[in-house]
A protein has these predicted regions:
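Flexible loop/turn segments at secondary-structure boundaries
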Residues: 7, 23-27, 76-79, 130, ...
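C-terminal cap of metal-dependent C-N hydrolases
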Residues: 83-87, 143-198
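Histidine/acidic residue-rich metal-binding segments in metalloenzymes
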Residues: 7-8, 12-69, 86
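A structural connector/turn signal
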Residues: 56, 136-139, 182
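A short acidic, glycine-rich active-site loop
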Residues: 42-52, 91-96, 173-177
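Single conserved hydrophobic/aromatic residue that forms the stacking wall/gate
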Residues: 1-11, 201-209
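His/Asp/Glu-enriched, well-ordered alpha-helical/loop segment
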Residues: 35-42, 63, 67-69, 75-156
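Residue-level signal for inorganic ion chemistry
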Residues: 18, 72, 105, 190
Length: 209
């Protein structure tokens, strides 16, 4: 698909590709796990594929034929997933991923040399702002931009676990994966909103009122 997107971009210049962070690091072996719950928690569309496909996705990000990395975050609980016991088609479709998108991408992208820090910023922020015609108000550090910023610590480390995540769901598809590179602070319109994982600020800014 990434090859087709690349060719279409050359012709129409209006075709965009977006892999999910889950597909960059997880593969179809997740569905063969002996624990039914483990497999069902990872049911999503498109489903995970053979691990060999991941090289093509990374190459698409490197070449620019794939523009941004998303999650399709759907926080279905294990109990909700169990609606599909006995009928696969009734398993709610989707997984979590929003909280871990950037640390996993930094670790597996920048940490392995697949992406540069600038490419990381592009596929997590700048490119989507441009696609949605929100640039340079969003996706840029410029005078007049909204100052929605993440202060990143490339040396900070953690092991991903459902027991310590912010999400209220009872599992994490990246459980046990070690990541190096974490957000320290998040600013919304120039005001510190999150620090070291703690939410500080929820009031709307004057522009939002």
């Amino acid at each position: 698909a990434s090859c087709l997107v690349g060719s279409e971009m050359c012709i129409r210049d209006r075709v965009w590709g977006e892999p999910l962070i889950q597909h960059l690091v997880l593969d179809e072996s997740e569905y063969f796990h002996p624990d039914w719950d483990h497999a069902a928690r990872r049911v999503m569309s498109p489903p995970f594929r053979d691990k060999r496909h991941q090289d093509s996705l990374w190459a698409g990000l490197q070449s620019g034929s794939l523009s941004c990395v998303a999650t399709d975050h759907c926080a279905f609980t294990t109990q909700q997933k169990r609606n599909g016991i006995g009928d696969f088609t009734k398993i709610p479709n989707g997984t979590g991923g929003l909280e871990d998108r950037m640390p996993v991408l930094w670790t597996q992208g920048v940490g392995t040399g697949r992406l540069t820090p600038n490419e990381f910023v592009a596929v997590t922020s700048t490119n989507i702002a441009k696609i949605l015609n929100m640039y340079p108000r969003k996706g840029a550090v410029l005078v007049g931009s909204d100052a929605d910023l993440v202060v990143w610590d490339p040396e900070a480390e953690k092991v991903i676990s459902a027991g310590t995540q912010q999400s209220s769901i009872d599992y994490n598809v990246f459980e046990g994966i070690s990541v190096k590179g974490l957000p320290r602070f998040t600013l919304s319109r120039g005001v510190v909103a999150v620090t070291e994982g703690c939410l500080l600020y929820t009031s709307p800014s004057p522009r939002d009122k």
